[in-house]
Curated annotation (Swiss-Prot):
NCBIfam families: PRK05416.1
GO MF assignments: ATP binding; GTP binding
Residue numbers binding GTP: D56, V57, R58, N59
Its biological purpose: Displays ATPase and GTPase activities.
PANTHER family xref list: RNASE ADAPTER PROTEIN RAPZ
Sites where the protein binds ATP: G8, R9, S10, G11, S12, G13, K14, S15
Lineage: Bacteria, Pseudomonadati, Pseudomonadota, Gammaproteobacteria, Alteromonadales
Species the sequence originates in: Colwellia psychrerythraea (strain 34H / ATCC BAA-681)
UniProt keyword ATP-binding, yes or no: yes
UniProt cross-references to Pfam families, sorted A to Z: PapZ_C, RapZ-like_N
Protein name: Nucleotide-binding protein CPS_4546
Family as reported in the entry's similarity comment: Belongs to the RapZ-like family.
Keywords for the protein's UniProt record, in alphabetical order: ATP-binding, GTP-binding, Nucleotide-binding
Length: 284
């Protein structure tokens, strides 16, 4: 049986993730006390192949440090993966203000920002051991649903998933990136009048960048670096590795390089994904 534990700070998108898993055929249980998790798995192990449970701060044991020990009591036949959702503090505050929901930890004389900080501390034993961490600050509910679906389906083979993500430094570095490469020194199609409105997936931009020897060398060196160290990461039981490529706006150079790296690695591996975070953001 495959078990996915969905956790994260309040307002980060756990309900969206759980709905996606339900749509994918998972038997879903919302907000189960973690102390009951071993009993639940023993009950459903013969009836369901895929199970997902949502765990929030209200259902933790008295000592959150006991969480790894509780998970260790699960049947050995259960393949456990933890998905942890989070967002920047300012975005969580904004979401609570917009929805006018009450944070579950708010008590008398406790401000919202204090409750959010406390929740982060309480959930740290889960977040630090998560197999997949997603920061939802820059994701709409629809984008989050697509990303969760992509990552879950990408794990069918059980091998490590390699994600090549493009982004723009002007919009911030992806929080979930394991490796970050800066492509801002490369020739920029943005300054070519005919290419400015296109992106790194358009043929004219690809032709422009492919003609630059320095771009080809940059891609080759990243490719060689990752090929060298991926076997060591896999032996460390990593589920995902995200390689983020950044340029100024996240539309041309980083997109092209991420696509080329993914193309190269697909010759050797099956679980390759691409994510172009900022490709649809309008230029300012």
């Amino acid at each position: 049986m495959k078990l996915i534990i969905v956790s994260g700070r309040s307002g980060s998108g756990k309900s969206v993730a759980l709905r996606v898993l339900e749509d994918l055929g998972y038997y879903c249980v919302d907000n189960i006390p973690i102390n009951l998790l071993p009993a639940l798995t023993h009950t459903v192990i013969n009836d369901y192949e895929n199970v997902a449970v949502s765990l929030d701060v209200r259902n933790l044991p008295k000592d959150p440090e006991d969480i790894p020990e509780i998970i260790a009591y699960l049947p050995k036949a259960v393949d456990v993966n933890t998905l942890f959702l989070d967002a920047d503090d300012n975005d969580l505050i904004r979401r609570f203000s917009e929805t006018r929901r009450l944070h579950p930890l708010i008590k008398e004389n406790m401000a919202l920002d204090q409750a959010i900080a406390l929740e982060k501390s309480l959930l740290e034993p889960i977040s630090t051991n998560a197999d997949l961490y997603i920061n939802t600050s820059q994701l709409s509910p629809h984008q989050l649903a697509d990303l969760v679906r992509e990552r879950i389906l990408g794990k069918k083979t059980g091998s490590m998933v390699l994600v090549f993500e493009s982004f723009g430094f002007k919009h911030g570095i992806p929080v979930d990136a394991d490796y970050v490469f800066d492509a801002r020194f490369l020739p920029n199609p943005f300054w070519e009048k005919s290419l400015k409105g296109q992106t790194g997936v358009d043929q004219e931009v690809k032709d422009f960048l492919a003609s630059q020897a320095i771009v080809t060398k940059f891609i080759w060196q990243i490719n060689s670096f990752m090929m060298t160290w991926l076997p060591h990461l896999e032996r460390n039981n990593r589920s995902y590795v995200t390689i983020a490529i950044g340029c100024t706006g996240g539309k041309h150079r980083s997109v092209y390089i991420a696509e080329m790296l993914a193309k190269n690695f697909r010759k050797e591996r099956d679980d390759i994904q691409t994510h172009h975070r900022d490709i649809d953001i309008k230029s300012t």
